[in-house]
Regions:
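Catalytic alpha/beta active-site cores
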Residues: 1-230, 248-251, 255-262, 296-303
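Short acidic (Asp/Glu) and glycine-rich catalytic loops that position anionic groups and cofactors
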Residues: 10, 57-60, 87-88, 130-132, ...
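Short, glycine-/Ser/Thr-/acidic-enriched flexible segments
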Residues: 20-22, 47-49, 99, 130, ...
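Conserved, mostly hydrophobic/aromatic
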Residues: 38, 74, 115, 241, ...
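Short beta-alpha connecting loops at secondary-structure transitions
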Residues: 62-67, 92, 131-141, 176-178, ...
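Glycine-rich anion/phosphate-binding loop at the beta-strand->alpha-helix junction
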Residues: 189-192, 220-222, 227-312, 316-320
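Flexible, glycine-rich loop/tail regions that form catalytic "lids" or insertion modules at the edges
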Residues: 313-314, 318-325, 329-456
Length: 456
């Protein structure tokens, strides 16, 4: 039923597109265009050298500069990236992990130059280095020191940037690495426990302020095309997070126990054959995180239809943004309370996922927690096993992927009529230009001041 007169219509979620490539200047122009089209938050993609802490002129950065994200090497790059963008009003998500503390420092410094009050800045640093050992691999330090860095960022933001989300605990990448719904929920919760235990045990936050730390934990989740199961998974996340916050950490304020999450729907499930089918996949996956009022995402970014082919163009990202806007502003979805309350089917699946996740959480905690389970190889082995099983089901035709293992006969797609022009391409001269720029920056900086700062 619609909301009673004393309840407000739900507000639209923050709408983002994951974007950035070539250079800070190029990406700044892209962000401005996206904001002008009605995007309500920014999601910054960094290139691999930036993610792993290499300058663009390092030999290991060769061929990767500006390719899958924007290169940021110093504060001048960050200034260029946010030139003309009102940082005090922006809600910026930065997908950065091993070097999160450094990128956050640059962002905060530039925001201060803009005149922004750091205590009012809104946004997120992903900062989940633990999942890098299980999926992406862009780590720079061993697990335990990485957890210490995460802890320091959490403590700093809670004290100095209280509206900032210091970590996005990522189940997203776990699913793409093979996780079942139970594993995805369990391992994300284990990571959250490891982070919160580390902050508590560090002694840097008073016991009276610890509930505020718990309240700033946020999650970044995945949603695949099995959208009913995915919706149930998110309801299970909410139940388990409530239990952990209340029972393990003694948080009494219900607002600080809310499962706060953003989402990008499943990119790995998008297909290169018949890529036009990705449009309906993306829409169905978006429903998983928006249909249920009690488990609705507060920030959504959708991949473009052609992401399996390469870097999407600005128009492709606009199409993904318009999907969100049509759902939020044209339909009546936000007029209603939760559509699934009382559903026996939903409640049974939620209970099944939650029970399985509780058992797996207990198993990991019995090993010594998330760090121990990463160092022993347990978590990785479980994900590899699940991924292998998933691949077998696809190869055997048990799991149907339209256009890949069934319904493969097709007419030529007009969306691909332009061939290579169907995707964005990075100018091959970009890397040389970025390298030249950082060398000029080094030559022009005050080396004595740099040395003094390093000594201090």
């Amino acid at each position: 039923m619609p909301y009673p007169s004393d309840r407000e219509r739900d507000r639209p979620w923050v709408m983002r597109t994951y974007a950035g490539h070539s250079s800070a200047t190029t990406s700044n122009a892209l962000y401005r265009r996206n904001l002008a089209k009605g995007q309500t938050g920014l999601s910054v993609a960094f290139d691999l050298p930036t993610q792993t802490g290499y300058d663009p002129d390092h030999e290991l950065a060769r061929g990767e500069v500006g390719k899958v994200g924007v290169p940021i090497s110093h504060i001048g790059d960050m200034r260029a990236l946010f030139d003309g963008i009102p940082m005090a009003q922006a809600n910026t998500s930065m997908t950065i992990n091993a070097t999160a503390m450094w990128l956050l420092a640059l962002y905060a410094s530039v925001a201060a130059e803009h005149g922004a009050d750091l205590a009012q800045l809104s946004g997120t640093t992903q900062n989940d280095i633990i999942k890098e050992y299980l999926s992406r691999g862009t780590y720079a330090f061993p697990p335990a020191p990485s957890l210490r860095l995460i802890t320091d960022v959490v403590v700093y933001t809670v004290k100095c940037m209280p509206k900032w989300n210091p970590i996005n605990i990522c189940s997203y990448h776990l699913q793409e690495a093979g996780a079942t719904p139970v594993q995805e929920v369990a391992y994300a919760m284990c990571t959250a426990i490891a982070v919160l235990d580390s902050v508590r045990d560090s002694g840097q936050v008073a016991a009276t302020d610890f509930a505020a730390v718990v309240g700033r934990m946020s999650f970044f989740v995945n949603a695949g095309v099995r959208f009913v199961e995915e919706m149930c998974k998110l309801r299970a996340c909410g139940q388990l997070w409530e239990e952990i916050c209340r029972d393990r950490y003694g948080v009494t304020d219900p607002k600080l126990r809310r499962f706060r999450y953003g989402v990008q729907v499943n990119s790995l499930g998008l297909t290169e054959p018949q890529p036009e089918n990705n449009v309906q996949r993306i829409v169905l996956e978006m429903l998983a995180v928006t249909l249920s009022r009690d488990a609705r995402a507060r920030a959504v970014q959708l991949p473009a239809w052609n992401e399996a082919l390469g870097l999407p163009r600005s128009w492709d990202q606009q199409w993904a943004l318009r999907m969100q806007q049509v759902l939020a502003y044209e339909t009546d979805l936000l007029d209603y309370e939760d559509l699934f309350d009382g559903s026996r089917v939903v409640e049974a699946r939620v209970a099944e996922i939650a029970a399985g996740a509780r058992a797996e959480i207990d198993r990991v905690q019995g090993m010594g927690g998330a760090i121990a389970a990463v160092e022993s190889g347990y978590m990785k082995a479980q994900l590899v096993s699940s991924l292998a099983a998933r691949r077998r089901r696809i190869e055997d035709g048990e799991d149907v992927v339209v256009g890949v293992n069934r319904f493969t006969e097709t007419d030529p797609s007009p969306l691909q009529a332009d061939g290579a022009a169907t995707i964005e391409t990075v100018d091959p001269d970009t890397e040389a230009q970025v390298i030249e720029a950082i060398r000029a920056w080094r030559a022009g900086r005050d080396s004595a001041a740099v040395d003094q700062a390093l000594r201090e």
